[in-house]
Amino acid sequence: MKLEQVPTPSYIIDLGKLEENCRILQEVQEKAGCKVLLAQKAYSLYKTYPLISKYLSGTTASGLYEAKLAREEFPGEVHVFAPAFKEADMEELLQISDHIVFNSERQLRKYGQTCREAGISVGLRLNPQCS
């Protein structure tokens, strides 16, 4: 297809370059002993998730719907963060998340034990002098 024939708006992905970059990130994971996660808020082109998931450990989601997308399309860990969690969302997140980061001690007190009982690791976001 000629470039002029591509409908707009369109995203054109160089899969070779994407895989090359993923290999670099995999090497970082191995050498640093850490996990590299795909930030879905910045990149949610799920058609490329099968390729990316070969190299990265999982995803980060900024809420329930991104977490659902991750669980459905990206074989790996699902990490979730949100400024606040609704009760109904938390019930679903308990079924699909591997790690949840809370934005306040209050949220951690409210949901932390329930998460741990469901086998989900938890974290607390700290912003010294800000929150």
Protein language model annotation of sequence segments:
Residues 3-4, 22, 64:
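Residue-level detector of functional hotspots within protein domains
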Residues 21-31, 69:
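A short, N-terminal amphipathic alpha-helix
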Residues 1-12:
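Generic N-terminal amphipathic, Lys/Arg-enriched alpha-helix
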Residues 34-131:
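Active-site-proximal beta-alpha core segment in soluble small-molecule metabolic enzymes
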